Amino acid sequence: NKRTVEALIKAGAFDRLHLDRATLLASIDLAFDYALAQEANTHQVGLFDLTDDGHGSSTQEPALAEATPWDLRERLQQEKAALGFHLSGHLFDACANEVRRFVQTPLAHLEESREPQLLAGIVCDLRIINGNRGKLALFRLDDGSATVEASADESVFSGNTALKEDALLVAQGRVQFDRFSGALRLNAQNIIDLPTARHRFGKHLLVQIGPLAASEPGPSFSRVFSDHPPQRTTTDSGDVLMRGLPVRVRLGIRSNDGSIVEGTLALNEDCQFYPSDAALASWTALLPQGQVHVVYSGS
């Protein structure tokens, strides 16, 4: 049953055979076709099928299909689709290193304060209820260190796509002690997703190239800029704002004598992009050796 095998692959049951679950999932049809062919040939031994030991020779096993490996987030989401929960890690781990550059406080170290605080975590148990003042979103934020109950008024989440189950949410609001639950509770006043946080807190994207030979061409970025342009937003007064992240290139050139000269170039304002996950994946595909990252204030 292909569906059963698919679920087992997503859950990691075949990890000891092959660690790349995406490749295994893409190879299911090949595996079943090969198994059916083997079964059909089991009792059909011809004159030219006999080997030295008298047994029927099998057809050659097909190579595994090619597939893009899953990142941590995709792997955990596939586990939840198969099992109903994340088995091999926490969703926050997929973005923890980046998020901690602009949200330093783990939820385990959260303290009550009248001043608004900036928090980040994965949205869990999201539900919308009808309150006395309109709709109210109730959810939990979980960053792997702890969880905190949270709420957001309709004016905060209405028309905002950031509030989704299993999504990374950056929330600003007041944290107060809830006598009913006996724990801290967040009243979110502003919520954004990770791409918006990159634009808001990031200074620029740093792209490291080289060292290259003096005559060696560098990679072309034009496709990334055309596929992921800055987002246009219109203010209440009619002004058009561009939401994009600038790019800086750190370039190394190797001269004929072997010495290396390095310099950093700031691309012009036309060379900006919206820092979505897909955009960063495109940058990483161009420079896969960890040569691309968002630079945040203070880093």
Q: Residues of each region from the PLM?
A:
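Single-stranded nucleic-acid-binding OB-fold domains
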Residues: H18-L19, L87-F201, P211-R223, P229-R243, ...
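Charged, alpha-helix-enriched surfaces in structured cytosolic catalytic cores
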Residues: R3, Q78, L118, Y274, ...
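Sliding clamp-binding short linear motifs
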Residues: N1-E112, Q176, N187-Q189, L205, ...
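C-terminal effector modules of nucleic-acid-centric enzymes and ribosome-associated factors
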Residues: N190, R198-S299
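Glycine-centered flexibility motif
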Residues: G12, H43-D49, G84, G134, ...
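A residue-level signal for conserved active-site and pocket-lining positions in enzyme catalytic cores
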Residues: L47, E79, L83, G121, ...
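Catalytic cores of large soluble enzymes that bind and process phosphate-bearing ligands
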Residues: T68-D71, R75, L87, T161, ...
